[in-house]
Amino acid sequence: MALRFPRFSQGLAQDPTTRRIWFGIATAHDFESHDDITEERLYQNIFASHFGQLAIIFLWTSGNLFHVAWQGNFEAWVQDPLHVRPIAHAIWDPHFGQPAVEAFTRGGALGPVNIAYSGVYQWWYTIGLRTNGDLYTGALFLLFLSAISLIAGWLHLQPKWKPSVSWFKNAESRLNHHLSGLFGVSSLAWTGHLVHVAIPASRGESVRWNNFLDVLPHPQGLGPLFTGQWNLYAQNPDSNNHLFGTSEGAGTAILTLLGGFHPQTQSLWLTDMAHHHLAIAFIFLVAGHMYRTNFGIGHSIKDLLEAHIPPGGRLGRGHKGLYDTINNSLHFQLGLALASLGVITSLVAQHMYALPAYAFIAQDFTTQAALYTHHQYIAGFIMTGAFAHGAIFFIRDYNPEQNEDNVLARMLDHKEAIISHLSWASLFLGFHTLGLYVHNDVMLAFGTPEKQILIEPIFAQWIQSAHGKTSYGFDVLLSSTSGPAFNAGRSIWLPGWLNAVNENSNSLFLTIGPGDFLVHHAIALGLHTTTLILVKGALDARGSKLMPDKKDFGYSFPCDGPGRGGTCDISAWDAFYLAVFWMLNTIGWVTFYWHWKHITLWQGNVSQFNESSTYLMGWLRDYLWLNSSQLINGYNPFGMNSLSVWAWMFLFGHLVWATGFMFLISWRGYWQELIETLAWAHERTPLANLIRWRDKPVALSIVQARLVGLAHFSVGYIFTYAAFLIASTSGKFG
């Protein structure tokens, strides 16, 4: 018999139903469950696949550069970044009639094009790229890296070049390599690029390979470095009337601590960013020499963890046993990595708008909105994934004997306390926040808006004041004009910071009031509830009061029959599934809040947000309904316009989202009956019954149907909001 899909599971390959296909796809990446897998092959397969992942990333970024160089308007945009719309790529569509061709021909292009809302133009401009030739060079280089990655992946699957398990489990060497070799060296290299190429470009000087060795990045060269007069590198920074990309108002400093923003570009000073990357490089280069490898000096991570025993013995055996538990569990390591990456991605979303690093990106409002929303959604998916793999760790890898009475075991021992506290916090936040919103709704409905309960966020305002925001009238720390911190800030460090915090032309420490207080607590409710579901799913993954032996059922069992009071919806997978809905819900509130507050700021009618955000009807009417009018206007009696594609995507997104419920709200038996009826009709229809199938069609399993429903719900939800966000922002601000 010919080998059927999936080759990695003989049991599945012999399944006579369509379950073979779906389960095959579902377990294709679960290498641990494949036939004939060994620990060594598991590690080697994952290692090799990382190179494939890198190859795809390099190919994708190369494609971005290539298409902008080929079909974009980068050189025209460089001449006037604030008024030329950046083109991502051309649109070739044989269905376009004349109205469509006219609607999408913009940005100085000859035919229909897509506008770039990704910020790549601003990024490339900031780092010193100026011509299409530069972009082509970058595209070719990344293509080369992509090829190298593919070759490396193939190479590490050859018997001679396959690393051993001991190599993968050498935590100290890996840490040293990643800290020094990857973070440290790459940060140092980036500092070098900023100092040698980007900063000269911002001052109107082109540095390329042909003159790279002739142009001094600083008039005094390396002299100050070797004589210890490092402060010379900070002297004579760019002036406040510096025109970015020209020598007008330019200085000679390369490493500064100015603080605040470049007045023209509204982005962080390049010389501050070079300084930042140099400091990061230094820290990581040091950190990467801390762990003991072949030379017998430095820390052993196992020794560090074993030494972590809390005083007095009241917290058990501390971190004993953790080293082997983590080092032998890929799921634990992946969980830690995803948790860190998720937090970092969310921080990127926050910092990209509050402290914009790229020239002129702060004035490109649609790009700002798109980047914030994009990074928050990505963060949500990554963070939920962290808990999914945490749960799989407890089911597949956790050994109670190895972890007796250490922090991990003690966390499991008092999981009821953890879960009930989270539950209490979620209930408190939910009822109080909804209570305030609904009370305010009723007051507005009965025409007595003055009876709303409006709470000033005084603690948050105090924190903003401590960082230098003066408008609230708190006389504290950096907002206290007589204090030593304030005086030092004027001269020694970050003199531009206080101006930036108190200017209203950026997003640093936005003024907050009762509407912000309420939505902050709505978001806190979402975060705590999502966390509650995820934490409960992971801590109960091996067993709970109702079902003590979950471990034997695995990660994604649907139910254990009607016994024990009915055990549906209690697998670790079910917790993850439910949590993703809450995650999407929460990020909805986060992005609604960010977008509405910023739209009113950019339009100069901030009172609309302040007055309408204190009750639910305000959100529905003055944010969602009012801003979706552009979408519904993509086609009108006068023909179509450039928003029509978003109007279509808005409708299509709703369709995909609604389709999700077909899978989420139905019983498996209904589908099986439907399939049997369709198969019966097929077999009795002339001509059609000439086509047969090998696999008996069966309905999706409960877990699979939920996954398909969740996928449609998520994709449709994000498509719908993306169309709304981009159309409503670009429709207002161009």
UniProtKB/Swiss-Prot annotation:
The chain crosses the membrane at residues 46-69, 135-158, 175-199, 273-291, 330-353, 369-395, 417-439, 517-535, 575-596, 643-665, 707-727. The PsaA/B heterodimer binds the P700 chlorophyll special pair and subsequent electron acceptors. PSI consists of a core antenna complex that captures photons, and an electron transfer chain that converts photonic excitation into a charge separation. The eukaryotic PSI reaction center is composed of at least 11 subunits. It is a multi-pass membrane protein. This is Photosystem I P700 chlorophyll a apoprotein A2. Chlorophyll a B3 binds at M662, Y670. PsaA and PsaB bind P700, the primary electron donor of photosystem I (PSI), as well as the electron acceptors A0, A1 and FX. PSI is a plastocyanin-ferredoxin oxidoreductase, converting photonic excitation into a charge separation, which transfers an electron from the donor P700 chlorophyll pair to the spectroscopically characterized acceptors A0, A1, FX, FA and FB in turn. Oxidized P700 is reduced on the lumenal side of the thylakoid membrane by plastocyanin. Phylloquinone binds at W671. GO terms for biological process: photosynthesis. Belongs to the PsaA/PsaB family. Signal peptide: none annotated. It comes from the Eukaryota. It is an enzyme of class 1 (oxidoreductase). Pfam families: PsaA_PsaB. One of its GO terms (molecular function) is electron transfer activity. It is found in: Plastid, Chloroplast thylakoid membrane. GO terms for cellular component: chloroplast thylakoid membrane; photosystem I. Coiled coil: none annotated. It catalyses: reduced [plastocyanin] + hnu + oxidized [2Fe-2S]-[ferredoxin] = oxidized [plastocyanin] + reduced [2Fe-2S]-[ferredoxin]. Gene3D superfamilies: Photosystem I PsaA/PsaB. Chlorophyll a B1 binds at H654.
